[in-house]
From Swiss-Prot:
<feature type="DNA-binding region" description="H-T-H motif">
    <location>
        <begin position="30"/>
        <end position="50"/>
    </location>
</feature>
<feature type="active site" description="For autocatalytic cleavage activity">
    <location>
        <position position="127"/>
    </location>
</feature>
<dbReference type="Pfam" id="PF00717">
    <property type="entry name" value="Peptidase_S24"/>
</dbReference>
<dbReference type="GO" id="GO:0006260">
    <property type="term" value="P:DNA replication"/>
</dbReference>
<dbReference type="GO" id="GO:0003677">
    <property type="term" value="F:DNA binding"/>
</dbReference>
<dbReference type="GO" id="GO:0006281">
    <property type="term" value="P:DNA repair"/>
</dbReference>
<feature type="active site" description="For autocatalytic cleavage activity">
    <location>
        <position position="164"/>
    </location>
</feature>
<dbReference type="InterPro" id="IPR050077">
    <property type="entry name" value="LexA_repressor"/>
</dbReference>
<dbReference type="InterPro" id="IPR036388">
    <property type="entry name" value="WH-like_DNA-bd_sf"/>
</dbReference>
<dbReference type="InterPro" id="IPR006199">
    <property type="entry name" value="LexA_DNA-bd_dom"/>
</dbReference>
<dbReference type="InterPro" id="IPR006197">
    <property type="entry name" value="Peptidase_S24_LexA"/>
</dbReference>
<keyword id="KW-0378">Hydrolase</keyword>
<keyword id="KW-0678">Repressor</keyword>
<dbReference type="GO" id="GO:0045892">
    <property type="term" value="P:negative regulation of DNA-templated transcription"/>
</dbReference>
<dbReference type="GO" id="GO:0009432">
    <property type="term" value="P:SOS response"/>
</dbReference>
<keyword id="KW-0068">Autocatalytic cleavage</keyword>
<comment type="subunit">
    <text>Homodimer.</text>
</comment>
Length: 210
């Protein structure tokens, strides 16, 4: 059974909640919602959140000001029974999720990660081994162009895709490995192309799927 249709205001709040989770890693407070939408009182935000909960879009958790959980549509989940696309080697200059890069589908629900995983990327090399991301592992990735300092990102630098920890410092972007034998990649976006393709939201160990 499909979920009930949202009003324009409810859709605006739902989209803001999702965007806030994607960009900060946590749901917004009622005060933050009220400020963003233009409500005079957090109580107005609370009433709209209750409506979203009744319609099956979110779950409200008691005892915390950020107690909002996005719910997965059962029909959307059923439409993705094949699981998450598994991305292998990415050819230079092509979109990371181009059909030719999809080696298979891995039977895992993207909603088990927070935020949701959109695809799995096969890790090549040990540049992130100090934080347990090893050669051959499957990195669960949430597709987004926004990332904060300290997050592990999938980045495209010129024509190469790499997994590193992000640091923005002044005009430069540093992509740090988690391996003492390697040096960071330093990018000046004024003269070099760089794009954030997604953020890491989990790891599936290589011996768990081989």
């Amino acid at each position: 059974m499909s979920r009930k249709h949202l009003t324009a205001r409810q859709q605006e709040i739902f989209d803001f909640v999702k965007h806030h989770i994607e960009t900060t890693g946590m749901p917004p407070t009622r005060v933050e919602i009220a400020r963003e939408i233009g409500f005079k009182s957090p109580n107005a935000a609370e009433e709209h959140l209750k409506a979203l909960a009744r319609k099956g879009y979110i779950e409200m958790l008691s005892g915390t000001s950020r107690g909002i959980r996005i719910l997965v549509d059962n029909e959307e989940t059923a439409a993705n029974d094949d699981g998450l696309p598994l991305i292998g080697k990415v050819a230079a200059g092509t979109p990371i999720m181009a059909i030719e890069h999809v080696e298979s589908h891995y039977p895992v629900n993207g909603a088990m990660f927070n935020p949701n995983a959109d695809y799995l990327l096969k890790v090549n090399g040990n540049s992130m081994e100090k934080i347990g991301i090893l050669d051959g592992d499957l990195l669960a990735v949430h597709k987004t162009n926004f990332a904060r300092n300290g997050q592990v990102v999938v980045a495209r630098v010129d024509d190469e895709v790499t997994v590193k920890r992000l640091e923005k410092k002044g005009d430069l972007i540093y992509l740090h490995p988690e391996n003492d034998e390697l040096q960071p990649i330093i990018v000046d976006p004024r003269i070099e192309y760089i794009e954030i393709e997604g953020i890491a939201v989990g790891v599936i160990r290589n011996n768990a799927w081989m």
